[in-house]
Amino acid sequence: MDAKKENDILEKTLAIAESGYPEAYQFLMDAYEACPASYGPQTLYFLSCLAGGTDKKTDVLMWLKKAISDCGWWYRPEVLEDDDLGLLKDEQEFLSLKAVSDARYAEAAASSKACFSWMKKTAENLFLAVHGNTQNAETARADWETVLAGKDCWQIETIQSGEPDGYGTYRWSYDETSYLPVADAMEAVQDKGLSLIHI
């Protein structure tokens, strides 16, 4: 899966969806069908919602089955309560898929922990890349490595939230505890002889 390419396609899909779901659905479906291996859970979720927004109940179930049953992926429970999926809220097949996804989420949430990539100082300055919601440390690193390419005075490290958002992705809840992994990471590098730390 090419996370950068997938994110770019999803951003373009959102822009198209502002003018109409049918066009956005066709655009994303064409991109996916051209190279399915380049896309992950977020794309199948988008396809499900776009299909729902165009009243294609059979397609919604097809995409969710592919994600949850075929690929073994899962989503945060609230995500499958999206208005675009509302046409399935009483469908037994949808409820069964949601139950499987919810159970996988609960299992992941019970064992997930924040991760800080720091091992040792390798450059004068530290750039701490923090991912956004529905992303992960790998995404954050890839986004910032291109910006800092060729700047050897910077060491890029990542902090990943301990709160899962979906299969392979994480989120920050912006509550009284979600900032703690970042604060702990900052504290861990305070005495490492760095000239500058940037988040």
Predicted segments, located by residue:
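A domain-start/cap signature at the N-terminus of enzymes
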Residues: 69, 73-126
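Conserved small/polar residues in nucleotide/adenosyl-binding loops
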Residues: 197-199
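Serine-hydrolase catalytic machinery in alpha/beta-hydrolase-like enzymes
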Residues: 121, 125-193
